[in-house]
Amino acid sequence: MPELPEVETLKNSLKDKLIGLIIENVELKRDNLRYKLSPLLTTEILNTNILDVRRRAKYLIIDFNNDYSLIVHLGMSGRFTLQSANYKTQKHDHVIFDLSNGEKLIFNDTRRFGMIYSFKTDLLEKEFFNDLGIEPFSDLLTLEYLKDKLQTKKIPIKNLIMDNRVIVGIGNIYASESLHLARIHPDKSGNDLRDDEIENLIKAIRDVLTKAITAGGTTLKDFVNGDNKPGYFTKQLKVYGREGQSCLSCSSTIIKIKHSGRSTFYCKTCQYS
């Protein structure tokens, strides 16, 4: 599933190309994605100017000049790409937005776990994103904030940093990578972390996410940006997907365990604490 770096990459690839354009037509090829698409989607943003393209957590947001926003979640296999005017519709193209410059914005999703909504812009944080935690790059992510969230939690730290009510945008890949960089065992209980470990973890999360964004995200199978290009952070992964291989820091063997049904990768030597 695309995480923060992939959605940030998607935003960066689309923003300058979309701002100022108008949605001239919306075609719903299939309305039963993860949730049924509202027929209002074809009218609420029609003939409106795109003001901004931004990200919140793992959601892409397109703001329009009529005070509505389009919210897109890629799910497991979603792709949201710009295509030329002569683009031929593909099998899993579910929503097609015709743009005023002749191009098309296509939402394609093989597994249909993606979501698209239209929502009043000024109500997004209060009603749509009301359960979300803070952004990893926010100044609000401090030792005090994370310590407060962890002090009563007797669950593995990996589960905690993947909790979108605490910190948004961190999924399986970047949780494993961040904990390896911070040298923290993924099974360590959140309330057992020392202050210096929490500070190291915050720094590691930001460092890993920054490098991933710079590399265009991680493409394991489906992810591409708005220009239909894959991400290359896969080549920089230190532990994720490397079970049985040598740790790139110490040459010990990378181990895979399960957390809540998800695969977790770590180095028993580097991540001893």
Swiss-Prot record:
**Record flagged with keyword Phosphoprotein:** no
The record's EC number reads 3.2.2.23, 4.2.99.18
What does UniProt list as catalytic?
A: P2, E3, K58, R262
Q: What domain of life does the native source organism fall in?
A: Bacteria
Does the record carry Zinc-finger as a key word?
A: yes
Query: Which GO molecular function, any one, fits this protein according to its record?
Result: 8-oxo-7,8-dihydroguanine DNA N-glycosylase activity
Provide the function of this protein. Involved in base excision repair of DNA damaged by oxidation or by mutagenic agents. Acts as a DNA glycosylase that recognizes and removes damaged bases. Has a preference for oxidized purines, such as 7,8-dihydro-8-oxoguanine (8-oxoG). Has AP (apurinic/apyrimidinic) lyase activity and introduces nicks in the DNA strand. Cleaves the DNA backbone by beta-delta elimination to generate a single-strand break at the site of the removed base with both 3'- and 5'-phosphates.
Species this protein is from: Rickettsia africae (strain ESF-5)
Q: How is the cofactor bound?
A: Binds 1 zinc ion per subunit.
Q: Cite the binding residues for DNA.
A: H92, R111, K153
Per UniProt, the FPG-type Zn-finger stretches lie at 238-272
Protein name as it appears in the record: Formamidopyrimidine-DNA glycosylase
Which keywords does the record carry? DNA damage, DNA repair, DNA-binding, Glycosidase, Hydrolase, Lyase, Metal-binding, Multifunctional enzyme, Zinc, Zinc-finger
